[in-house]
């Protein structure tokens, strides 16, 4: 029951029909109808789902994949069975059974040829599914109410219908709030500040409208009579409003797409099988078939469901070397969409034959004995008859399908173990054209130290689906990790040619160009990246660093500022590494100092030092203080400059960075000399700097040694005394009270 149906004109009355005491409202038995048909088991199963999904992730996934064979797949087949198993039904819905089916088949072929279509088709399936669930819940609610003789008035029906529609709109707002975390699900990117109050209003409307309608129904009947109606309304709340209610009350975000798929699909499917099995039984009995069997019907649905979902992706993948993962999703989406369309056409209570079977089980179907005598009917009767050949064909077909399903289950079990290398290898042997398996295999081989094999698996994943951007970028990053920079450069060059507007690929391509010495090309690609996405923080940072190295300090500062603003805007959701942020803060302060923005420069250096202290980044805290000291000296704040140098040197004492420490002591010595402090302190600091660099030869040591010699010459004979105890003077220098001359 996939649509929110309208009542027949003759039933739209302003006064309620009196309840009938002769009609039985139940389909099977009260406990089965309430539990399965009305969804009373939703709450305990959803709670169990949250627990097991977190505690037993792999087992829970496998359980769902197996349940798909018993409920999800058969429920699709139930619709196919209903519309294709007789000539009358086939012709009645010909536009759906033939024309729509052919259009969807063409869409499937196009999607296999053009991967970019898959996200659109898959998003349509994801967004249509909740509407389908809503329509079924509402249709069953109306069925139970009318079977109990408590037909809702037009106002009551409208209130219930609008409340159910409101719950669906609420769910769609949740789906389309913010960016999508799944490449296959497109989002409108609505702002939470707009959707949150809208969702709250829709939730209140659902409670108010449905509450009023249910209260009105209760007044003219009794609680037991409308218990199925109450239960279905509660089920709609659990399926659609509960996540929003949790988010509104606690502020904890729940992924609605995950919540609304998986277990909800199983609950919906079992509900569908419950009502269709009743309908098929009543229809068969009305047509004079006294041999109808639920077990035979269920086996038919299971076998047919397997045929709908499993062979197609395997055949396309193995024969045409298409990506099994993409093919499976394509078949899943299109079979679902066809099911939604068919379901909306065939399940309408205004159809007199459906109403006769679902609302009044005593009436006869007008279809009884009306089967056309033609070749289609004859073939159908032979295939379903008792002839040995027909029976053997049925058994053989079912056996093949069940074996195929078993192989598919085994493939899923092996591929779901992310760290079990032998299992993943067996899954890859079953189907080497499965990009998902190849990616997991690559990760497992990387962990096992088999780097060449891991890279080969990633290459297979990328080659089996060249239109998948994520796979191509993953392969490119794998090449970088393997040190094959030239190959990675070529790979990202291909990616840019196919996806010129992908900011991440432009950033990686620019980085590779820089590492291979193509600096102009690197800057060009980073500029393209920030043009595509100004919030691409890495591109802003790399571009700033490149411009800084070229001496374009102010141009670099502009990009540093954008980088810092971007990081600050998303820090709560995606904290960045503190090192680049601190370095950027210092660079921006340097740029402010260069153009005499003294207040901004001072705040920038102080902020960098304070942030570094809180983050435990001692090296960068020292660097910020040294830059601050140099700035303070230029601003004639000699006392402040001395204190900044001394704080930096005290921090350096706890670091193991001889070059930076020696450089800071050298700069402090030069500062003391410029401020005409006693030469013995200058010499002691230079001697200390030189001693730190003794085991680190290079240009720094040469410069420091030259400065020490010049200071020693100025100091004369007193230098000998300093050499005997340089440590004492070094310690004293950290407490000098240096003031302006």
Feature map (PLM): residue ranges:
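Register position in tetratricopeptide repeats
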Residues: 447, 481-482, 515-516, 549, ...
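Canonical positions in the second alpha-helix
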Residues: 427, 460-461, 494-495, 528-529, ...
